[in-house]
């Protein structure tokens, strides 16, 4: 009489075990079950099968991990398809929310980011390496394992009320998009904007998200007081290319419409042609600027593709998957602009690179903005209207 192990039944061809193949063989031999008669499927979590609708194709470990995880084909069928990765949001209570920098090539010295990670999933995002500080992967983790900071408005109010605080424009969206999809549920960006508006504090916002239209009531009021300007990033006008490299970002035409609606509300808008990818999206530079101008943008800027740390292998993996015929040429152009390396992090070099190709793109930009009548300097914002917030329980000033 033959005994069939409980988890492997001849009548259930689709059954599977989550064990090692060698252990399955020993188990079947011990129960005198001919191994060749049964198909045992191994459940294996492969990111390639689960990354549909995401920018990154893998979830490689970060530079701080001591061990590297790799997939190996053991000859078994991969089993039933696992569901696509879902976005997970956890909560962080920050001690501070304003981050200061001394970078000479940035037009601001402070910023706030109310989320860590970004569901937009732009494969080229230079902020991906920041997820490594959290013990997470700059790959798929960056766009699926997000962190919200719901106490950010209260912390911001406290920092603005500090006696030693000196007012200067704050940037929002420098690391992750403040209007990414999870903002619809959490509303942290809107609450922070209200704090800034009440205090008369200037703010510059960078986004790709349509959700900014929800806050036109606050933004238009701040614009009338000279307290806000907005940058809308448009990487390409090609909808197919956009879906591939920034899968959860509004389509290019929709982003141009955001510019139009903000401009109609009297909000100063900049069209940001960034990042420009050589031999892929940079031929569209003039068309992007023209579309932004037609929609009401007052100013324009551009940045070349940046590949810091873990971003380089992610982008190269993406190029090999979607544009194998251009991958070599694109990487050659980037290395040409960064002294033979994938990326040069030096101030003044990192944003646009150097060399003939970088200068050619810069010259095209200068000619285009002059022809279109676009400014390159941002709209000036006022700092003289700032009044420190009065915290609950604090004594109000008599003067």
Describe every region a protein language model picked out:
Residues 1-4, 8, 12-19, 23-26, ...:
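Short terminal hydrophobic/aromatic SLiMs and anchors at protein ends
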Residues 5, 171-174, 270-274:
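Short beta-strands and strand-loop turn motifs
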Residues 32-89, 93, 99-100, 283-399:
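Auxiliary Fe-S-binding modules of radical SAM enzymes
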Residues 80-116, 120-231, 235-243, 251-264:
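Conserved Radical SAM active-site core
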Residues 195-201, 258-269, 337-340, 364-375:
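A structural motif corresponding to the C-terminal end of an alpha-helix
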Residues 205, 237-239, 245-248, 261-282, ...:
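Conserved strand-turn element in the central/C-terminal portion of the radical SAM core barrel
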Residues 210-213, 277-286:
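Active-site glycine- and acidic-residue-rich loops that bind
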Residues 224-227, 268, 294-298:
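Glycine-enriched alpha-helix->loop->beta-strand junction motifs that scaffold or abut catalytic
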């Amino acid at each position: 009489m033959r005994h069939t192990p409980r988890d492997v039944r001849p009548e259930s061809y689709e059954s599977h075990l989550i064990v090692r193949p060698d252990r399955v063989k020993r188990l079947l031999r011990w129960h005198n079950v001919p191994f060749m008669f049964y198909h045992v499927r191994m459940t294996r979590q492969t990111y390639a099968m689960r990354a549909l609708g995401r920018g990154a194709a893998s979830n490689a470990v970060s530079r701080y991990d001591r061990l590297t995880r790799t997939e190996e084909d053991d000859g078994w069928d991969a089993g039933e398809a696992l569901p696509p990765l879902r976005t997970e949001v956890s909560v962080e209570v920050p001690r501070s929310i304003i981050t200061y920098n001394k970078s000479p090539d940035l037009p601001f010295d402070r910023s706030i980011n109310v989320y860590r990670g970004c569901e937009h999933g732009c494969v080229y995002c230079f902020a991906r390496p920041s997820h490594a500080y959290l013990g997470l992967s700059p790959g798929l983790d960056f766009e699926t394992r997000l962190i919200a900071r719901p106490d950010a408005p209260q912390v911001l109010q406290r920092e603005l009320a500090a006696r030693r605080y000196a007012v200067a424009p704050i940037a929002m969206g420098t690391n992750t998009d403040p209007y990414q999809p999870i903002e619809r549920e959490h509303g942290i960006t809107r609450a922070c904007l209200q704090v800034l508006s009440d205090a008369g504090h200037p703010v510059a916002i960078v986004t790709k998200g349509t959700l900014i239209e929800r806050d036109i009531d606050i933004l238009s009021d701040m614009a009338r007081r000279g307290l806000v300007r907005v940058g809308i990033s448009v990487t390409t006008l090609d909808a197919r290319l956009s879906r591939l490299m920034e899968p959860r970002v509004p389509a290019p035409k929709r982003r141009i419409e955001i510019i139009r609606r903000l401009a109609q509300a009297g909000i100063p808008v900049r069209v940001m042609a960034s990042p420009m990818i050589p031999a892929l999206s940079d031929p569209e530079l003039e068309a992007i600027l023209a579309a932004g101008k037609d929609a009401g943008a007052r100013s324009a800027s551009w940045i070349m593709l940046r590949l810091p740390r873990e971003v380089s292998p992610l982008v190269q993996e993406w190029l090999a998957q979607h544009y194998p015929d251009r991958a070599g040429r694109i990487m050659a152009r980037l290395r040409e602009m960064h002294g033979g390396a994938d990326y040069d992090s030096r101030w003044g070099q990192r944003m646009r690179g150097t060399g003939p190709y970088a200068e050619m793109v810069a010259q095209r930009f200068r000619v285009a903005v002059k022809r279109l009548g676009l400014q390159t300097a941002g709209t000036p914002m006022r700092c003289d209207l700032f009044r420190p917030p009065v915290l609950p329980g604090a004594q109000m000033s008599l003067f």
